[in-house]
Amino acid sequence: MRRLRNVKIVATLGPASATYDTIRALFESGADVFRLNMSHGSHAEIKSKHTIIRQIEKDIDRPIAILADLQGPKLRCGVFENGSIDLQIDGDFLFDLLDKPGNKNRVFLPHKEIFNVIKASDSILVDDGKIRLKVKSVTKNQIKCIVEIGGRISDRKGINVPQTIIPTTALSEKDKIDLEFACNLGIDWLALSFVQRAKDVNEARKLAKGRTSILSKIEKPSAVSDFNSILEASDGIMIARGDLGVEMPVQAIPPIQKRLVMACRHVAKPVIVATQMLDSMVDSPMPTRAEVSDVATAIYEGADAVMLSAESAAGNFPIDAVKTMDNIAIEIENDPAYRKLIDSTRSGQRKTVADAITVAAREIAETTEVTAICCFTHSGTTASLVSRERPRVPIIALTPLIKTARRLCLHWGAHCVITGHVDRFKKAVISAARAAKKYNFATIDKQIIVTAGVPFNKPGTTNIIRVSPVDEKLIFSGDHE
């Protein structure tokens, strides 16, 4: 099945999308990657969805990527004697380490590490920023606050401390258990929540032991500040605008999103724009105009993927949400302004032979009538470099490794094909021509670009580029390679 757009769609699975028929319908409607949220559902439920996805993959004969999203060290308050209290503006309130139900004056905060680093005048946000308190003073077991924005606070509501770098790992004990479980299942991408620094990524990578690719979620101010080192340590990025929009001024999010998308593209690492993209479609079959513009903006900026969360996991119209996102993407990518924007933000980075070859492939495609760029890739690096160029013609990523094919499903434009092992460039060209015909990227009278590395099956050796006819009778006519 050939997609009619290049940006990828990530769909979160949940109660509304737990059956074979629904998940297959999501794929057929446009979902390229399925997200399993480790914050919700048991290991048995996660495994069931994973099994269904792999069965669909087998049935349709197309690689599908699976992204497991770890919960991360989410901060929460304790419980209250009566389930909730109302905080009044300018009133005093206390967070402490006393493990007993709270009242109108105090509540348990079961995160001792915060008491060591939070300072007077820092903010504490409750329930996704609906309630805001300012710290007046701190002792080793109490944080005294004044209420700046009041409201009702109930049991175990989420807590954010935007001005504080918490001296804790990004992986809770639950996360470590979930990480091992997900890696043993065979997931393709592992998303780390509440990353603050590069060493958080390195810790997860050490535990993953090469079994999956690491994707860092940018949702804290400290992660934005340390983004370059986090990006270098990661295989991909998710701009998780929910918590990021709570901890930072909402007006700061759009320029941050634009900068982060551009930075990821420059280093050829995939970036997902996520959170509330079509949020109204949880309850409505139609999105708001503002939501359509939000999705469009991410696509115009050059994001590799856009993501659905509650819309596909728990909404009433999961399939419609995917179809809507697919239709938006097709419309935007057919807009002449889209191509102008994509071309104007292209990276000029050309440091290696592989960089030069992928740039040349894109330039040849722009000046000739070739119909596709076919890249043989073992590790996925060549395909990611071609994807970075955002060529005007389709990208066919050919690899003998199902693991590589699945992982590349997140990259802009990559149509992933499993091919047999090849040991001669002529065989590679023939394989590329057959794939181009099979998936309707080219007819027999057209030409394609083929890139590869010799010796074959050795990562990082991209060193050949050739324009080839699709007609096998004409391939290397008279060439005895």
Question: Where do the protein language model's features map onto the residues?
Answer:
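Non-catalytic helical/linker scaffolds that mediate oligomerization, partner binding
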Residues: M1-E481
